[in-house]
Amino acid sequence: MQVYNKNIGYTLLRSLWVNPIISLSLRRLVVRGKENLPKDGAVIIGSNHTNALLDPLVILRSMNRATIFMTRADIFRRPLLQKVFTFLKMLPIYRIRDGYAAVKQNEEIIRKCVDVLRHRYPLALFPEATHRPKHSLMGLSKGIFHIALEANKQFGHEKPVYIVPTGIEYGRYFRYRSNAVVTYGKPINVTEFVRQHEGEVTPARLLAMLREELARRMSELIAFVPDTEAYDARWELTKLCTAQSPPLSPAERITLNRAAIARIVEKTDSDPEAAQALYADALAFKKERRLRRIHPSSTGHKHPLIASIGNTVAL
C-alpha cells in the first residue's frame, strides 16, 4: 500500500479525530496565507516545531486535505506500528542520532517522498528535526532540501516544486485551550531558484542558499527571538513590554511581539554592557515572578523594576 493511496478509513478518521482534538485543545485556530499554497506544482510544507502532537494536527486541519507527514524513524521499528503510521500517511525520516547506517536508508525515503509529490500530495516536514516550546528556530536539517532538489531534478521540467515556509504560534505553550495561529508564507519556487543559480554555485552551496532562504522566511512568520544565550531574557522583556496592551487578536499579538522584539534586540545590541545588566534584571524578575505565580499579563509598570526595564528598552 502506497502512503498516498486514497483510503476512506483515513478520511473518516481525519474528520472524526483531528477536528475534535483541535476543538478540545485550542480555543481558537487562526489560519493565514492559504492563498500562498501553490496549485500548479508540488508542495512541501516547511514549518517550525514547538509541539509534538498539535503541530501536525494544526497543519492537517488548516490544509483540510490529506497531507503526508515526515516523522522520526524510531517509531516505525515495529512492523505493526509501521502499518499504522503508513495508514496515517506518515513516512519515517532517519536522523544522525539514529546512526550512519540508518541515515543511508533516507535515500529510499527520499524516493518515496518524490513519488508522493509527483502524485500531487502535499508533503509536510519540520526541518528543525525536533520540537521545543520556544519562539525561535534551531538550525534546519538538510532533508527537506534534498527532497525538494531531487523532486525538481526528476520532474521540475513538467511542474514546479515549491517549499512553503510555515509558522505556527501558540498564545501560551502550557495553557489548555490557548489560541494558535498558522501562517503560510510566500512559497520558494525551488525550480526557479535552481534555474537562476545552476552553474554559478556548487550543489552544496545551492542547498545552503535554500536553507538560508527558508530559515529567513520562517522566522518572519513567528514572534522570532534569535536563538542565543540571551533568548530567555529577551522573551521575558517582550512579555513585560507588551503586558499592558489592549485585547488583541492572536495575529495582532504576533505583530506586537515582533515589534517589541525588534526594539529590544536593537537597543541591547547597541550597548552590550548595559544589555547584560538588563538581561540580569529580567531573569531575576522572571525568577521572582514565577515563585509568586504571577503571569506577565498581571504586571504593571508601577513596579519599580518593571518601570526601569520599560524605560531602558524605551517601549
Regions found by a protein language model. Name each.
Residues I306-L315:
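Alpha-helical bilayer-embedded segments of polytopic membrane proteins, i.e.
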Residues R27, R65, T86, K159, ...:
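Residue-level signal for beta-strand positions within conserved beta-sheet cores that form or flank
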Residues L12-I21, V84, I144, L210, ...:
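Hydrophobic alpha-helical segments of integral membrane proteins
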Residues V31, R78, E107-I110:
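Structural motif corresponding to alpha-helix initiation and N-cap regions
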Residues L24-V31:
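Short gly/ser/thr-rich secondary-structure transition/capping motifs
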Residues V3, R97, A102-L305:
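Non-catalytic C-terminal accessory region of glycerolipid acyltransferases
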Residues Q2, N7-S15, S23, L37-A102:
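Catalytic core of membrane glycerolipid acyltransferases/transacylases, capturing the structured
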Residues G33, T71-R72, K89, F126-P127, ...:
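A secondary-structure boundary/capping signal
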